[in-house]
Swiss-Prot record:
Upper taxonomic lineage: Bacteria, Pseudomonadati, Pseudomonadota, Gammaproteobacteria, Pseudomonadales
Organism, as annotated: Pseudomonas syringae pv. tomato (strain ATCC BAA-871 / DC3000)
HAMAP family per the UniProt record, alphabetical: YdiU_SelO
Keyword Metal-binding on entry: yes
Gene designation: ydiU
Name assigned to this protein: Protein nucleotidyltransferase YdiU
Disulfide bridge map: none
Highest taxon listed in the record's lineage: Bacteria
Amino acid sequence: MKALDELVFDNRFARLGDAFSTHVLPEPIDAPRLVVASESALALLDLAPEQSELPLFAEIFSGHKLWAEAEPRAMVYSGHQFGSYNPRLGDGRGLLLGEVYNDAGEHWDLHLKGAGRTPYSRMGDGRAVLRSSIREFLASEALHALGIPSSRAACVVSSNTPVWREKQEYAAMVLRLAQSHVRFGSLEYLFYTKQPEHLKTLAEHVLTMHYPHCQEQPEPYLAMFREIVERNAELIAKWQAYGFCHGVMNTDNMSILGITFDFGPFAFLDDFDEHFICNHSDHEGRYSFSNQVPIAQWNLSALGQALTPFVSVEALRETIGLFLPLYQAHYLDLMRRRLGLTVAQDQDDKLVSQLLQLMQNSGVDYTLFFRRLGDQPAAQALRALRDDFVDIKVFDDWAQAYQARIAAEENGTEQARKERMHAVNPLYILRNYLAQNAIEAAEKGDYEEVRRLHQVLCTPFTEQPGMEGYAQRPPDWGKHLEISCSS
């Protein structure tokens, strides 16, 4: 493991030039102090965990100091926001400090969010508040622990710098890690501003740096697009299977790598509600939980439009058409596993859809249902869960079909089923009320709850003694919280 001054930089994106980003220095925040750090995220940079305890660590990730090799850049992009094209967005408060080349041969972007004003800040102050920084940190690391592809968060640094949102808050910075920060909107910007040479340069960069194996195909850009479609189908299947609602699926928030990216008013489901809207600005429900699948496909179509100089429209349409069947296959496989099933059968989609409708009608806690279903032998678990449902007879019919389905597999003991189910059904998820409790403590200067919650979320499938309070249904005030985009 390395010290902070031993990191190796190879700033590939910065070398593309000023058509793609603008050199900007971070604006430091006052009295920086570390709120929380992720040891596993820092390990991606080969950074020893004790480095986060040094004063230099907080100074670097609050904008006070920089490596000589860093080349901070604000990236330019556009995007479709709530379905309407916005011609010029860009990093309004975040900076790509540089790319670290680790000992495993990987490049990791260091993106400092809340780093101050840039040419793309529009009327904003370029700051992020402590509240949103903690939420992004916890969400990134929670999704990663669940096995859902995501950008990572290495740390949060707080300050005494006041900023105004609905009220006075304090500025913070979060260090985000990803192997690329190129978005769908990065390519859209160059396409719609009619910069064909720069569009080709960026497309080549994505192809050679992130999809090099596609270069061997007869149509490299089509092969790359197909893999992006495949990755997004798998990503959205995992969101839906684990009850994650992103909240702002604009094309500028979609990663070219098919990872969860740009956290805002996200939420995990408490009670199952397919129509759940986590963003209080989403008045029409465009980005509701159930709409995430069609919106992802719509966003892929928007990306495909930007690739029309390199791939035929017919081939792009055909590839986009693969999204839904790929999604359905991934989703059904995940839901089978959540139910403890190991063999695919034709009626599995009906078994799943009937269960979800029952949960919807009865307001059943989505996460705890699956965990409790695996806690005991099936017959006992179903009896214990029965009282959670309004229509007992319909639930009993479903339970009978489920037990028959388990019996048909004949592939092991109840203990083996329990172990299988506990390996894929988390006990701990990032419920909004848990995040809110941690934020309120942090805003008073107490960071212990953020750190404790982070540690719990790092091992979501394993029961942790003394942490029972993190595995409960939310109190009434904590249910169905809608979160503001204000950050």
